[in-house]
Structure formats: structure tokens, C-alpha cells
């Protein structure tokens, strides 16, 4: 858990012990003498702490990497220090943007009815529809099968169905036309369905046609049907050179397939996967230890938990 103590607080803790004039947010940039030196001392102390050990638990984070068909190697994030190669998983890329509604309903276009469409902060964030519809277009591959998952809650226990439509235009039903009704009120209901794309652009439409109740959509998820999450096996670069590089370097797509292994590149700035990926819809999830950023503004905080902040000052 990251700390909450600001750079300004840390500086003033030191200045107070030295019986020096403390800074405020308005005087922070105009620091002088011992005040400026204290700024530098704190950053030096933080640097010493973070460089004493590479794998501090509070610097452990995760990221995702979109995969491109035929592309073998990828670079680590800018703040990367060391990767946990036991954490690399290959999954199907999530195609819906902001389908979790964590803080807003951005990326969704509403279709007016007699009611409204709005953001609800209930749960982890939801799209609230009351006699309103919302849709989003996603990129798809013609004739490719996809999984769609939708969770909805009925705030007034009215038993009103949510229309879920998938097609080549907003409210289109060429690929899927179904409803989702909540019967276990308070628990919600989940739709698990599949569809086959008939266009490179596919529209997902959610529609509550009644003002009798709010239908709260908790999440919408779409991914390719035939991609099963797989842990990537780590192999050393030496083993990659000795074992499979001859296959990957052949200028032919015949050997493109679902990647099974991951290796660290020789410069330690990235990773490679093998076999070469056969599609663009894969995504790699992995964890790594990041490098810290020096404190600079008054409101900057440490990655270090507050309980350990006295180590710095």
C-alpha cells in the first residue's frame, strides 16, 4: 500500500526537528538554504533505501502488453526494474473499453428515451439505465466467435428485462438479440453468451425500455471465444537460441501459433515470446518491480507505506 505522507510533510518533519522555519504549499517553490537542502536530503535517503533492495514488496506492480501478430519481442515499461517471469500469462484481449464502469460511463454512447442514463457509484461502479440505451462499437474479425458477459442488477425489483443486442449498427441484432432478467433481486443476473462477428466493426447495445426501474449494468466483457488463458513457461535466452530460434526466424507464417514460452531479451530491456503469435487479440499479463520516481512537488507521496516513512526522515 502506497504512502499518504506528502513530500511537504516529510520536509517539515525534518525542519521541525532542526527548529527551522517550515514550508507551506505556497512557499514550497521558494525554499531557501536548509529548506532546499532538506528537499535534497530526503530524495537521497529515498534513493538509498530503494537501491538497497531491488524487490521491495511495495514496488511490486502489474501491467498488460497487447500482442501483435508476428511480433516476437516487446519492451518493458519505463519504470521497470526486474520482471517476475513466473507471473506471465497469455489471455484473450478485452475488447470493450471501460466495460467495468469503475469511475464513469465514458466510451459509451447513449440513446435517449423517456428516462436517463447515468453513472452509479454502487459496487465498483455501474452504468444506470432508466428507459435509456447505451452502445459501444468494438473491432472484430469477420467469422470469428466471441464471448460476451454482462451482469445487471434491478434496483427496484421490478423484473424488467435488459435487452442485449449485438450487430453491425447501434441496436443491431444481426449477431445476438437476447434479454437478461433479474430474479434474485440484490444478487443480480449474469448473461454468458457467444456470437459470431459479421463485420470488422461490431456494436454492443444495452437497453432498458422501461421507467419502472433502474437497471444497473455492473460490467460488459467481450473477448475471442477460443483463447484459453495460459501460463507462459520461462526459458533462458541461451535455451531459446539453442532450441527454437531456428523455427521463429523462418520467413513464413506457417509456424505462427499461440505463444507458449517467454524469455528475457539479452539487453534486459524487454521480453520475447515463442512461437510467434498468430493473431492480434492476445494480451500478456505480468508483474514486475518498478523503479521509484524522485519527489518533486509538494503533494508527491512515497511508494513506501507510511509506517516506514520514519526510515527516510
Provide a role label for each language-model segment.
Residues 1-99, 106, 178, 183-187, ...:
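Glycine-enriched, solvent-exposed interface loops adjoining structured elements
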Residues 101, 132-157, 191-195, 220-222:
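Extra-cytoplasmic beta-strand recognition segments
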Residues 103-127, 253:
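Extracellular glycan-recognition surfaces and repeat-rich motifs
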Residues 123-133, 184, 294:
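Extracellular beta-rich ligand/substrate-recognition surface
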Residues 157-168:
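Beta-strand acidic-aromatic groove motif in beta-rich domains, primarily in extracellular
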Residues 171-201:
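Extracellular carbohydrate recognition and processing domains
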Residues 192-222:
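Extracellular beta-strand ligand-recognition surfaces/modules
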Amino acid at each position: 500500500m502506497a504512502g499518504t505522507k506528502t513530500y511537504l510533510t516529510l520536509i517539515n518533519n525534518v525542519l521541525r526537528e532542526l527548529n527551522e522555519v517550515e514550508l507551506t504549499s505556497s512557499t514550497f517553490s521558494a525554499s531557501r538554504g536548509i529548506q532546499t537542502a532538506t528537499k535534497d536530503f530526503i530524495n537521497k535517503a529515498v534513493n538509498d533505501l530503494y537501491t538497497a533492495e531491488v524487490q521491495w514488496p511495495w514496488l511490486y506492480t502489474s501491467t498488460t502488453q497487447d500482442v501483435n501478430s508476428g511480433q516476437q519481442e516487446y519492451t518493458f515499461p519505463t519504470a521497470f526494474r526486474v520482471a517476475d517471469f513466473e507471473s506471465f500469462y497469455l489471455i484473450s484481449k478485452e475488447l470493450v473499453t471501460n466495460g467495468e464502469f469503475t469511475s464513469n460511463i465514458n466510451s459509451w454512447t447513449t440513446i435517449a428515451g423517456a428516462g436517463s442514463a447515468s453513472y452509479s457509484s454502487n459496487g465498483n461502479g455501474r452504468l444506470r439505465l432508466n428507459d435509456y440505451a447505451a452502445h459501444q462499437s468494438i473491432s472484430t474479425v469477420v467469422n470469428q466467435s466471441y464471448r460476451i458477459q454482462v451482469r445487471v442488477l434491478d434496483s427496484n425489483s421490478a423484473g424488467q428485462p435488459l435487452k442485449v443486442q449485438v450487430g453491425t449498427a447501434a441496436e443491431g441484432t444481426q449477431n445476438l438479440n437476447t434479454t437478461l432478467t433479474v430474479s434474485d433481486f440484490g444478487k443480480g443476473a449474469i448473461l454468458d453468451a457467444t456470437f459470431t462477428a459479421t463485420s470488422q466493426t461490431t456494436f454492443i447495445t444495452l437497453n432498458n425500455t422501461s421507467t419502472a426501474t433502474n437497471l444497473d449494468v455492473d460490467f460488459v466483457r467481450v473477448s475471442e471465444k477460443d483463447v484459453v488463458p495460459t501460463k507462459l513457461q520461462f526459458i533462458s535466452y541461451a535455451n531459446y537460441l539453442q532450441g527454437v530460434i531456428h523455427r521463429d526466424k523462418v520467413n513464413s507464417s506457417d509456424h505462427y501459433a499461440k505463444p507458449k514460452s517467454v524469455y528475457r531479451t539479452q539487453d534486459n530491456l524487454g521480453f520475447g515470446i515463442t512461437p510467434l503469435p498468430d493473431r492480434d487479440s492476445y494480451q500478456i499479463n505480468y508483474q514486475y518491480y518498478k523503479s521509484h520516481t524522485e519527489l518533486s512537488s509538494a503533494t508527491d507521496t512515497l511508494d513506501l507505506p507510511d509506517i516506514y516513512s520514519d526510515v527516510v526522515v
